[in-house]
Amino acid sequence: MRALLLISTICLLARALAAEVKKPAAAAAPGTAEKLSPKAATLAERSAGLAFSLYQAMAKDQAVENILLSPVVVASSLGLVSLGGKAATASQAKAVLSAEQLRDDEVHAGLGELLRSLSNSTARNVTWKLGSRLYGPSSVSFAEDFVRSSKQHYNCEHSKINFRDKRSALQSINEWAAQTTDGKLPEVTKDVERTDGALLVNAMFFKPHWDERFHHKMVDNRGFMVTRSYTVGVTMMHRTGLYNYYDDEKEKLQMVEMPLAHKLSSLIIIMPHHVEPLERLEKLLTKEQLKVWMGKMQKKAVAISLPKGVVEVTHDLQKHLAGLGLTEAIDKNKADLSRMSGKKDLYLASVFHATAFEWDTDGNPFDQDIYGREELRSPKLFYADHPFIFLVRDTQSGSLLFIGRLVRPKGDKMRDEL
């Protein structure tokens, strides 16, 4: 059955190419980005290392299905803790980021520069709406110096919140997130367990704008196999083009790199050959291994099919960051966040990292000159109808805008597969 679907996809792609190749292609505007300073480049490398450590920690959590992390935003959250902390509370935040050898001013200036560069949606021609807000109990007043510095470096807002009326407090948090993302992320959380400390909330909406768009008329309903015995109905989008591609026969995986508009970043997908839990691939996934795989990629004709739609994920990163060494800030009896309020009256109760990530067809027009090439007649197939890992990578610094996995997209159960 799956083989028939693949054959039908190729036929549909061929017809779509014939229909669209006649359209003139507008040249994409070249991307321009200022070169990062040495301190920002160093922190870009450190944040990439953090990305894999945190992803691996979360992947081992049986309660976690889909994962969506923005490592640069997580790094900024650690910078914020370092900015507001003293003694071990501050030094642990830097250590988790592997930035203990950097001065405090280098960390904050470097992370601020990196965050501004990677989240510049105009230069990158992507949609990335990002907001960070630190909520404190109504009894706490944030220090003016901290408010000013955290806004300057991390564009972080601050607010008091009264959890005596928990329903109203949750509504306020979710309304702020919805407003920040233009309604794309309607809810961060349904509940907050610890209400006597500070809550750090990151709310994001990200939508890639492809360097060459998918066929907007070639969208159909297919099955996504969460497991061999559980399939959900999803909308799939398709296109054929020339991409960096690698098929690892030994490890039974394939990967493809898709440039985003302006080519300042790209989306990389790593997928097992067959339906299986991602645990095997995740054990292989490191910053060094990714570099090895990317070094083996070659430009190939690839017919790509991806799920279309919005994936919404909220993670409370508190326990996962604690597992990486951030133990003082989250401990009510040990936390020293006195630079935040002037007193040792705060601890980090939750770190909500909430993202809506939209997979859509939008992008630049096709380069029509490539479609007469012989190699496009027999493309490699990249049919993402089962769980996969993905990364959005900055082409200049190697920093990761996002790292995640799609295990269970939105969709109704279809039928059990044999």
Curated annotation (Swiss-Prot):
Glycosylation site list: 120, 125
Site (Reactive bond homolog) residue list: 377-378
Residue positions where N6-succinyllysine is found in the record: 94, 296
Modified positions (Phosphoserine) in chain numbering: 141
Signal peptide from the UniProt entry: 1-18
Keyword Glycoprotein: yes
One term of GO molecular function: collagen binding
Modified residues (N6-acetyllysine): 207, 319
Keywords from the UniProt entry: Acetylation, Chaperone, Endoplasmic reticulum, Glycoprotein, Phosphoprotein, Signal
Major location category of this protein: endoplasmic reticulum
Cellular component terms (Gene Ontology): endoplasmic reticulum; endoplasmic reticulum lumen; endoplasmic reticulum-Golgi intermediate compartment; extracellular space; membrane raft
GO process annotations (BP): chondrocyte development involved in endochondral bone morphogenesis; collagen biosynthetic process; collagen fibril organization; protein maturation
Localization per Swiss-Prot or TrEMBL: Endoplasmic reticulum lumen
Motif residue range(s): Prevents secretion from ER: 415-418
Family statement: Belongs to the serpin family.
Biological role: Binds specifically to collagen. Could be involved as a chaperone in the biosynthetic pathway of collagen.
Protein name as annotated: Serpin H1
Organism: Bos taurus (Bovine)
